């Protein structure tokens, strides 16, 4: 934050490919203390797939929810989106963190993910959510191989026609290492 970040993303459950899930209690215990320390000082994005974690974080002062499951993991997350109207990232991913890389199959990754977002937007609107605090994340590295990731980066502008801001997460991405042939990415 002191180096220029406008927001810090905090999460208590790893969602990197191959990771194992943690229960709600474990996840909350991992983030509760840090949120208490920083949420009033620094804008916080809460990275979670669980509605109760989202609601607890929002009540503490979290400014944005980052749902890497794209509203797919916990059916109650859409109620949080409707109730609180804070910015909410809907990320594209397939499967679960544990198996997503095995499910990296697309006819055309750009169009398939575009259709995925169209379906999520229809779902949101069908639930009576009118606000536009939605951010779309094509999920670089989440259920995608090197070719998929590169095509998404090259063609990310296709998603602008959906009418929402686009977020491209780039933390610790293995494909950067694969391209650069360096181990420090």
Segments (PLM) and residue ranges:
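Active-site-adjacent loop and "lid" segments of alpha/beta metabolic enzymes
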Residues: 15-33, 37, 43, 51-52, ...
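Phosphate/pyrophosphate-binding loops at sites that engage ATP/ADP/AMP, CoA/4′-phosphopantetheine
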Residues: 5-6, 43, 118-133
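Active-site metal-binding loops of divalent metal-dependent hydrolases
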Residues: 140
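Catalytic domains of carbohydrate-active enzymes, especially glycoside hydrolases
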Residues: 1-11
């Amino acid at each position: 934050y002191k180096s220029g970040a406008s927001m810090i993303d905090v999460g208590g459950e790893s969602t990197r490919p191959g990771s194992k899930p943690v229960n709600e209690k474990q996840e909350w215990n991992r983030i509760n203390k840090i949120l208490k320390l920083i949420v009033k000082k620094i804008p916080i994005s809460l990275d979670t797939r669980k509605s109760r974690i989202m609601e607890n974080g929002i009540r503490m002062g979290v400014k944005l929810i980052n749902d890497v499951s794209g509203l797919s993991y916990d059916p109650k997350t859409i109620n949080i989106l409707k109730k609180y109207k804070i910015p909410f990232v809907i990320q594209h991913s397939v499967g679960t963190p544990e198996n997503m890389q095995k499910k990296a199959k697309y006819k055309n990754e750009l169009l398939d993910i575009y259709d995925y977002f169209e379906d999520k937007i229809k779902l949101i609107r069908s639930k009576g959510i009118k606000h536009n605090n939605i951010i779309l994340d094509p999920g670089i590295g989440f259920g995608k191989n090197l070719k998929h990731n590169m095509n998404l980066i090259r063609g990310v502008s296709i998603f602008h026609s959906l009418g929402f801001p686009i977020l491209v997460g780039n933390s610790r991405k293995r494909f950067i290492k694969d391209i650069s042939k360096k181990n420090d990415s």
